[in-house]
Regions:
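Charged interaction scaffolds used for protein-protein
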Residues: 1-12, 23, 27-42, 62-104
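Short linear motifs in exposed loops
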Residues: 16-17
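N-terminal glycine-rich flavin-associated loop
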Residues: 20
Length: 104
């Protein structure tokens, strides 16, 4: 698997975060620094938001809303993956964007 890449129903999606995205997430109430210190536990609303922000950098023409991201997330979970694998892909992409070494 390529880092940050997931396949859903034969279509590839790349999850990537940059500093502008991380700041936008904070403004939206999703503090990734609290996540990195263990102060924040993700619920499904936050997971969908994290997924949306990761997709919107590269797939902005296809993923225009959190609901769009939720549909892709549901398709992934129904057809090809599980929530733990998807969460690991998102967290590892986020860790790389912050300049830390990847962890599991």
């Amino acid at each position: 698997m390529v880092d940050g890449l997931i396949t859903v129903n034969g279509k590839q999606y790349f999850i990537k975060y940059d500093m502008n995205t991380i700041c936008e997430m904070k403004l939206d109430g999703l503090d990734v620094m609290a996540l990195s210190t263990g102060e924040l536990e993700l619920d499904f609303i936050q997971l969908r938001s994290l997924f949306y922000y990761g997709l919107k950098k590269i797939q902005r023409d296809q993923i225009k809303s959190k609901e769009d991201a939720g549909y892709v997330m549901s398709d992934y979970l129904e057809s090809e993956g599980n929530i733990e694998d998807l969460t690991n892909v998102m967290v590892n992409a986020l860790v790389r964007s912050l300049g830390f070494k990847e962890g599991k």
